[in-house]
Amino acid sequence: KQMPEWTAKRNANMARIQAVFEHSPYFTVPKPSSDYVHAAYKCYVQVNVDALPECWSRDRIMAEISAQAVPCFSGSCSEVYLEKAFDETPWRPKTRLANAKALGESSLMFLVHPTLSEHSLQKTVDAIQSVIAKIHA
């Protein structure tokens, strides 16, 4: 019963976070096609690592946002095949998958669940804005 409402709320939360990143050359905001409704269980943004000033990295951005008591994570398990469980199995590729590696090294993930308060969401937006301002300084 509540899935449509929750999905709409997650998408609205994701849109607010994405809007903060959209105009910075240091980030890529993936936008799904309008042909379907994104489930938006998490909000992912890619850091354009090569565009960052020398003293900045994805990990520093993550640490700076987290230091403001805002949950910010490295994202998905893009190369799960590197886990020990895949040792000695036919499911590990012979060479690392280039796109999976790049996404794993550049992703930032933010929470967008429908129970986030307006205060929490605004705190997230404010933290991201302050870190982007530091990068641009």
For each predicted feature, which ranges?
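PLP-dependent aminotransferase class I/II
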Residues: 1-137
